[in-house]
Every structure is written in C-alpha cells, then in structure tokens.
UniProtKB/Swiss-Prot annotation:
GO terms for biological process: phenylalanyl-tRNA aminoacylation. NCBIfam families: pheS. Its EC number is 6.1.1.20. Belongs to the class-II aminoacyl-tRNA synthetase family. Phe-tRNA synthetase alpha subunit type 1 subfamily. The lineage of its organism: Bacteria, Pseudomonadati, Pseudomonadota, Alphaproteobacteria, Hyphomicrobiales. PROSITE patterns: AA_TRNA_LIGASE_II. It is found in: Cytoplasm. The keyword Aminoacyl-tRNA synthetase applies. Its main location: cytoplasm. This is Phenylalanine--tRNA ligase alpha subunit. One of its GO terms (cellular component) is cytoplasm.
Amino acid sequence: MSDLEQLERQILEDIAAAVDEQGIEAVRVAALGKKGTVSEKLKTLGGMSPEERQMQGPAINGLKNRVTEALSERRTELRKAAVAARLEREKVDVTLPVRESAASRGRIHPISQVIDEITAIFADMGFSIAEGPDIETDYYNFTALNFPEGHPAREMHDTFFFNPDEKGERKLLRTHTSPVQVHTMEKFAAMRDKEGRDEPIRIVIPGKTYRMDSDATHSPMFHQVEGLVVDKSANVANMKWVLEEFCKAFFEVPSVKMRMRPSFFPFTEPSVEVDIQCDRSGPHVKFGEGNDWLEILGCGMVHPNVLRMSGYDPEVYQGFAWGMGIDRIAMLKYGMPDLRAFFDADVRWIEHYGFRPLDIPTLFGGLSA
C-alpha cells in the first residue's frame, strides 16, 4: 500500500470516528489546513520534476477531493442526527389533554364568536361571505354610495384620510363595509354582461371599519356586518323576513317583535332603523319579551343611484341592504359594559367573556351553548 493510500485510509477513519461538528473541523484542519497532511503533500509538487509532477499531481489532488467530499458528507450526517435528536427531546404528544388551568386555556374573542354566529345564520339562509380592503378610495367609500359632496362623513374630523398621492388623490380607511357592496355589484354586473350569467346577489360582509370616535360605546376601529340582496323581485317584505329570522336566531328566542322607524341613509331609499322588543329592567337585556325597544340595525332598499353606478338598471333590479355594529350587538347579547375592553388585550377579560375553541356556532346545536 502506497503512502497516499495509507494516508487516505487514516483520514477516512478519523472522519468516520468524528461524533460532532467540532470533531469534523479538527479532522479537516489536520488534513487540509495550512500544515495539514494533504496540504503538505500538495506542497511537495513544487519540488518535483515535470515527469514526477505529472504522475503524482492527479493522485494527490484526487486525495484532496475525496477527503473534502467525505468531510462534507459526514458533516451533513451529523447535522441531520443533531436535528433528529433535538426533535426527539422536544417532541410533544398532541394527544395529551390540555392542562386545566386559566393560564393554559385559550379563548375565542367575543368579536370572533359573534362574527361566526352571524355568518352561520346567514349561511343557513343562502348567503355567502364577501370581503374587501380596509383601505379604500373616495369613490367606493362615498361617491358610489350616493354620498354627496359636502357630506359630513367626508370631513377630516370623521374619517381617517391618507396623505394625497402624486396625482393628488387621497385614500382612506373605510368608514363602513358598504364599499364591498359596490365591488360585488360591479363584479356580478360584469359577469352578467360578459357571460350572460344574471345571478342574484346574496352576501353578508363582516369586517373592520374606522372612524374618529372614542368613548365607552365607540372606538376608532370597530367591526361592522352588512348584508346585500339584489334581484329582480327583492322587496321590503323580503327584507323584513330576513331580519326577523336573523334576530330570532341570533338572540335565540322563539319569536321577536320588530318595529321599523323611518330614517335616512344616502345609499338606501326608503331607509329605516329597526328596533326589537326587549326587557331592560334587569342587569342584562332580555330579548323577545318586555315593554322596551332597542335599536339593532339600519336598513333599506338600495338607492337607485347606487344600483345605476354599480351597473344595474333600477327599473329592472331592486335590492335591499342592512348594517349593524358587531361590537355593539356583542355587548347587548353578552352583557359587556365597555366597548374599549374589547381591544385592551386583558387576559382576565378574555377568560371571563371569551368562548371555548370548540364552541362552534351552528343553528342546529345552538349558537352560544
């Protein structure tokens, strides 16, 4: 066996014997470092004759390449083994029961729970969920919804505006989820015109909205849910039935009395506000009984101007829409006194008012059981 073969055998044995990356590095330095055994062999090439160099050069360089490859392979093996060992030490048995302590139990935030309850109810009535961007243009937030120039909502003290862009246009944080109604109508109108699919619209729109307001019952960021129906035969009777069914299901009562009061919204005509019967004599509001009335939501028939700007002929199509504050109805249903507590991230509050993760709301099993 030649000297090179003996040297290669010894180095490969040292590599195989290394048990960690420090050991591999020590072998590399001993073989390929400045004064390493393979490096010393390479240095001898300079003192050889051309004939000897031609014979020994490929052999020594081949040794260097094989040693380098063996070092790399062993280093990879050791890294994989280290990762596997760490995973074995840190593995968690996901089948073990959760520790029953207040600190370890997760809770669903009431806002998330109420959104799930609302969407479950409307999904049962054939509605789909629609969403849109929090940052909107003036057109979709105001103009397309029939807000005239000079309307108070367009003022800086009511709306969060961004600085104008290079074209002088200002975007804003949406003040309601209504822009999604316009986006959806435009989408369906385009589908009708291009593909001939004249489908009715039935959507519910939960989301965050923003206004410059902050007190015990108002927050600069709050949650709204709106609904929209557009069809050739949509009418006030349909709207009243949908809202009655929603109120009965959401407040979990067998029947509910509703009254509609004339109101004004730029995007609906006629516009009404809906009150439902309740009893406010105790610490918590009881719905479906008593002699009191409580405002729940606003609604109305979609204004002809809104239909027209969204691609619908108001002589052919009608629609109705409604909207309510998710935070407010959560407070009413579950007896929460201060809206600001929703956003304080107080673990004690979440523990008290939150819901268990597996309490998935369904109409069949009960919404908040």
